[in-house]
Amino acid sequence: MTDKSKESGSGKLLYCSFCGKSQHEVRKLIAGPSVYICDECVDLCNDIIREEIKDVLPKRESEALPTPREIRAHLDDYVIGQDHAKKVLAVAVYNHYKRLRNGDTTSDGVELGKSNILLIGPTGSGKTLLAETLARFLDVPFTMADATTLTEAGYVGEDVENIIQKLLQKCDYDVAKAERGIVYIDEIDKISRKAENPSITRDVSGEGVQQALLKLVEGTIASVPPQGGRKHPQQEFLQVDTSKILFICGGAFAGLDKVIEQRVATGTGIGFGAEVRSKDESKTVGELFTQVEPEDLVKYGLIPEFIGRLPVTASLTELDEEALIQILCQPKNALTKQYAALFELEGADLEFREDALKAIAKKAMERKTGARGLRSILEGVLLETMYELPSMDDVSKVVIDESVINGESEPLLIYTNSDSQAAGAE
């Protein structure tokens, strides 16, 4: 390499060691040990690396796609119950990614449409967890959006395009990667229109959002500003094809059960002609959700065009006490395993007796928050122990039973030293 630095007036004139341009011909010259590189060469190197990565991506695409049975088996490791919803999700996700791999048309020229998913189920039944677990298993970008924060374009709040913005952020603005992603829109029931008939006044956070979501969910070329900003209008917008993105919408749909019950009731008479049902005969919310029809969702407040964009509907049932006990200890990342791992870092074992698990599940049932309420119950029960344990010596085991859950006694501490144990018992 020839020495391209020479004296010029007050100092040396520096040259790029790669392309030979002087410091006056480029915007920036970065110095290393006896070498220099200009900003243009850095950009060129980045382009070369990007091309290399693109060559690697098709190899990944050629890997075998997990079958619906394999997807369902993975969901079983993390989500308890909801067998029908898992089966529906596994088939829908498999078909979606099979369509992406083989193109939108078959060899016969048949166009394959996109099937987005609507999850209906009570709070804490596992809607969000199912979507997260799916994305993690398939190793695709995943983002969550809250429908309650969305408004029509031009109003205070988030535009629907912000959803794609978040997805791009998750994959460092790699458009090709983002187009294979999954978007989960939570609280979709909260954007139902306020009345069954179209309103004269604008409903910017209800029907207006549904209208704005239509093209995005169905498939359109969304223009997203690079690196998130409208501060630089001269920047070129990124073009993202949303027809390749899988949209999963979820909501609790409180009150939908009454709409379904009204439709399925066989007795339409009034007075003596009306059908009388006992409390035992009345169906649970979960059972009613399995009978949901598009007309029920329209009556609830979703516009027909939006329901048409979500052809796959999966209903989740309420979790009973037995299912909550299983959630506490069976999944790979079960709560009892998580807290046991935390205690293990302090050098102590954590044991939950069978009656304690039942008491926790019973409390969660009373709160009507599903599996989401389990963590808050455990946090409250273990607070004092987690506060004191780091300052204590010789504690080898902490035992939790029903009386601890009910607030009648303190957790049992077992010490490695028998003298300390005797002192603790006193």
UniProtKB/Swiss-Prot annotation:
<dbReference type="GO" id="GO:0009376">
    <property type="term" value="C:HslUV protease complex"/>
</dbReference>
<dbReference type="Pfam" id="PF07724">
    <property type="entry name" value="AAA_2"/>
</dbReference>
<protein>
    <recommendedName>
        <fullName>ATP-dependent Clp protease ATP-binding subunit ClpX</fullName>
    </recommendedName>
</protein>
<dbReference type="InterPro" id="IPR003959">
    <property type="entry name" value="ATPase_AAA_core"/>
</dbReference>
<dbReference type="Pfam" id="PF06689">
    <property type="entry name" value="zf-C4_ClpX"/>
</dbReference>
<dbReference type="InterPro" id="IPR010603">
    <property type="entry name" value="Znf_CppX_C4"/>
</dbReference>
<dbReference type="GO" id="GO:0008270">
    <property type="term" value="F:zinc ion binding"/>
</dbReference>
<dbReference type="GO" id="GO:0046983">
    <property type="term" value="F:protein dimerization activity"/>
</dbReference>
<dbReference type="InterPro" id="IPR004487">
    <property type="entry name" value="Clp_protease_ATP-bd_su_ClpX"/>
</dbReference>
<keyword id="KW-0479">Metal-binding</keyword>
<dbReference type="InterPro" id="IPR027417">
    <property type="entry name" value="P-loop_NTPase"/>
</dbReference>
<feature type="binding site">
    <location>
        <position position="38"/>
    </location>
    <ligand>
        <name>Zn(2+)</name>
    </ligand>
</feature>
<dbReference type="InterPro" id="IPR046425">
    <property type="entry name" value="ClpX_bact"/>
</dbReference>
<keyword id="KW-0862">Zinc</keyword>
<feature type="binding site">
    <location>
        <begin position="122"/>
        <end position="129"/>
    </location>
    <ligand>
        <name>ATP</name>
    </ligand>
</feature>
<comment type="subunit">
    <text>Component of the ClpX-ClpP complex. Forms a hexameric ring that, in the presence of ATP, binds to fourteen ClpP subunits assembled into a disk-like structure with a central cavity, resembling the structure of eukaryotic proteasomes.</text>
</comment>
<feature type="binding site">
    <location>
        <position position="16"/>
    </location>
    <ligand>
        <name>Zn(2+)</name>
    </ligand>
</feature>
<comment type="function">
    <text>ATP-dependent specificity component of the Clp protease. It directs the protease to specific substrates. Can perform chaperone functions in the absence of ClpP.</text>
</comment>
<dbReference type="GO" id="GO:0140662">
    <property type="term" value="F:ATP-dependent protein folding chaperone"/>
</dbReference>
<dbReference type="GO" id="GO:0005524">
    <property type="term" value="F:ATP binding"/>
</dbReference>
<feature type="domain" description="ClpX-type ZB">
    <location>
        <begin position="4"/>
        <end position="57"/>
    </location>
</feature>
<dbReference type="InterPro" id="IPR019489">
    <property type="entry name" value="Clp_ATPase_C"/>
</dbReference>
<keyword id="KW-0143">Chaperone</keyword>
<feature type="binding site">
    <location>
        <position position="19"/>
    </location>
    <ligand>
        <name>Zn(2+)</name>
    </ligand>
</feature>
<dbReference type="GO" id="GO:0051301">
    <property type="term" value="P:cell division"/>
</dbReference>
<keyword id="KW-0067">ATP-binding</keyword>
<feature type="binding site">
    <location>
        <position position="41"/>
    </location>
    <ligand>
        <name>Zn(2+)</name>
    </ligand>
</feature>
<dbReference type="Pfam" id="PF10431">
    <property type="entry name" value="ClpB_D2-small"/>
</dbReference>
<dbReference type="GO" id="GO:0016887">
    <property type="term" value="F:ATP hydrolysis activity"/>
</dbReference>
<comment type="similarity">
    <text>Belongs to the ClpX chaperone family.</text>
</comment>
<dbReference type="InterPro" id="IPR003593">
    <property type="entry name" value="AAA+_ATPase"/>
</dbReference>
<dbReference type="GO" id="GO:0051082">
    <property type="term" value="F:unfolded protein binding"/>
</dbReference>
<dbReference type="InterPro" id="IPR038366">
    <property type="entry name" value="Znf_CppX_C4_sf"/>
</dbReference>
<dbReference type="InterPro" id="IPR050052">
    <property type="entry name" value="ATP-dep_Clp_protease_ClpX"/>
</dbReference>
<dbReference type="GO" id="GO:0051603">
    <property type="term" value="P:proteolysis involved in protein catabolic process"/>
</dbReference>
<keyword id="KW-0547">Nucleotide-binding</keyword>
